[in-house]
Amino acid sequence: MAQQRITSDIFAQLLTLSHLESSECAVGLATQIEDIIQYFSVVEQFDPGPRDDPDTDNAQGRCSQGNKIDVDCCPDWVRKDVALPGLSVHDLKRLSTEFADGYFRAPRALDGSA
């Protein structure tokens, strides 16, 4: 992957989109963004290759159209959102002795009185 640099135009656009003004603090943002972009180039080197998933009929990581599997292309590749039963109240009560009125009791940490 070619080395990408944050130009002053791109940085100005990022500041505008972020509703920030160009100040000394915001200028440090350009370096951070460049670091993030460089990190993604490092991560891209570790492509896992074809998927080997016995639960699918397509273990090559490609959908029927030959595209890489993604949610937009092949929504059937990702698992379905199915509500499964959770813990019963009886099981929850076994997790903690601090249980009252159907809820876990916790110290008042938000107002500093804990």
UniProtKB/Swiss-Prot annotation:
Note the superkingdom of the native organism: Bacteria
Give EC number(s), comma-separated: 6.3.5.-
Q: Annotated region Disordered: where?
A: 46-65
* Keyword set, alphabetical order: ATP-binding, Ligase, Nucleotide-binding, Protein biosynthesis
Q: Which purpose does this protein serve, as stated in its record?
A: Allows the formation of correctly charged Asn-tRNA(Asn) or Gln-tRNA(Gln) through the transamidation of misacylated Asp-tRNA(Asn) or Glu-tRNA(Gln) in organisms which lack either or both of asparaginyl-tRNA or glutaminyl-tRNA synthetases. The reaction takes place in the presence of glutamine and ATP through an activated phospho-Asp-tRNA(Asn) or phospho-Glu-tRNA(Gln).
Oligomer and partners:
Heterotrimer of A, B and C subunits.
Q: Return the similarity comment.
A: Belongs to the GatC family.
* Full protein name: Glutamyl-tRNA(Gln) amidotransferase subunit C
Gene that this sequence comes from: gatC
